[in-house]
Amino acid sequence: MSAKQLMFNENARHALLEGVNKVANTVKITLGPKGRNVVLDKAGGPVVTNDGVTIAKEIELKDKFENVGAKLIKEVASKTQDTTGDGTTTATVLAQAMITEGIKNITAGANPIEIKKGILKAVDAAVASIKAKSIEVKDKETINRIAIISANNDEEIGNLISEAMDRVGYNGVITVENSKTLETTLEHVEGMQFDRGYISPYMVTDQERRVVEFEEPYILITDRKISSLKTLIPVLEMIAQSGKPLLIIADDVDGEAQTALILNIIRGAIKVCAVKAPEFGDVRKEVLQDIAILTGGTVISEERNLAIEDVTLDMLGQARTVKVDQDKTTIVGGKGKKSDIDTRKKLIESQLNITEKKYDKTTLQNRLAKLSGGVAVIKAGAATETEVKEKKMRIDDALNATKAAVEEGYVAGGGVTLFRAIKALESMKADPEQMIGVNIVKRALEEPLRQIADNAGREGAEVIAMIKSNASETYGYNAKTDTYEDLLQAGVLDPTKVVRSGLQNAASIAGMLLSTEAVVVDFDEEKDKTSAAIII
């Protein structure tokens, strides 16, 4: 085991604070509509961004003790990103304010454990106040405003996101891809799409576009591997008599079965395309069942004691059209019963409500969306690769913030809801040392508003005084227009979940850091300084 450096008490906390400040001071200049950009020097070329978590993740400090502080503040941004996908800069600003004030008080002799308790109590009260002011999202215009603000006031992005949600529904899947043109566009994929293409280019029906397109096809759905021609003959004879095309979704189609299919296609005897089943393991079984219900077919599986030789026409699914390229399959207008599809959706929704794992949630959301309203794809276009990357980040931020607003509602933005939450702490009672923690949170709740004003070229203290003079809960400073007004009416909105999560994550990390008495890092005899540290 390598030698270690140890640092204790005040020295340790101040080293951590240095690291926190270096990250937070870099990130907080991006806050608000007039926040600045930061250029990141990356291997693929420089990236210009104002996304807090992206900036924070890039920072590594030379001093190992300071770097521990940097990692802790980065954790605030990462946790907020994981929870809501936005609000990372606000969370970082809140954490820095709590840590700075907390260390001042601990240095003066206050008990860090009691301060931590006070901080957590105050944050609980502030969160209750924020939730009480939350307004449910009910219209497209609100979604549009939230998306625009989260995309750094880009109206084009806001309009695309609100249109995408309008098309696929609030639970619909919206993805972001690179555009092959300079334009940023929205594409709506109706029906169900999954990431599996044709197993052989011989199956292509449109050679110029390299796609398979079938109208009114039958669909064979199975989790079995098809290798034997004998297995397929009864199905192919039925299809030939029907005169309709066939899409096969199977674990795989290989050997003489694949050869026979290709020969029949070349001869013009039948129209057929085979694709591998999407997903893996238990998820594959569920997705195949989704496809079967959507198309009115039956999954031919060992579990059901069904063999491919026993398939009848009524076991095959049907759809209006099917399109297959080398990467994906799209089924449009599945002919399953609406009642069966609705029952399936309710089952997935109930599973979504009880599952806690992020991967399982994402999988269930994707399945529900494909059964509900298809998939919307926002294609980010710009003149250079750097601009495309930056635009994709803004679209992702706006998309995540909008989804958060749909989930928990929205509040007045511009830092004013956090600022007004101070009122909820005025009447709090606690032990004297816990009250220090409460006062730390009071001071921290001003900081996002102060920083937004500073970034807009205004004096933070002056802006705070002006807002205090008006009793309205939603009256605040609109940095975009440089005016004081009712921010709800002006459309300056923040998702409740983003505001709440940022505050809770900031308090969690601040409490952890303030109650730290020692820091242990690796020691390199040639590189490391030894001042204020003990080497073991």
From Swiss-Prot:
Q: Which InterPro entries match?
A: Chaperonin_Cpn60_CS, Cpn60/GroEL, Cpn60/GroEL/TCP-1, GroEL-like_apical_dom_sf, GROEL-like_equatorial_sf, TCP-1-like_intermed_sf
* SUPFAM superfamilies to which the protein is assigned, alphabetical: GroEL apical domain-like, GroEL equatorial domain-like, GroEL-intermediate domain like
Record key words, sorted: ATP-binding, Chaperone, Cytoplasm, Isomerase, Nucleotide-binding
Span of the signal peptide: none
Q: Name one GO cellular component term.
A: cytoplasm
Report the EC number(s), separated by commas if there are several: 5.6.1.7
Function field: Together with its co-chaperonin GroES, plays an essential role in assisting protein folding. The GroEL-GroES system forms a nano-cage that allows encapsulation of the non-native substrate proteins and provides a physical environment optimized to promote and accelerate protein folding.
**Which HAMAP family does the protein's record reference?**
CH60
This chain belongs to which protein, by name?
Answer: Chaperonin GroEL
Per the record, the gene is: groEL
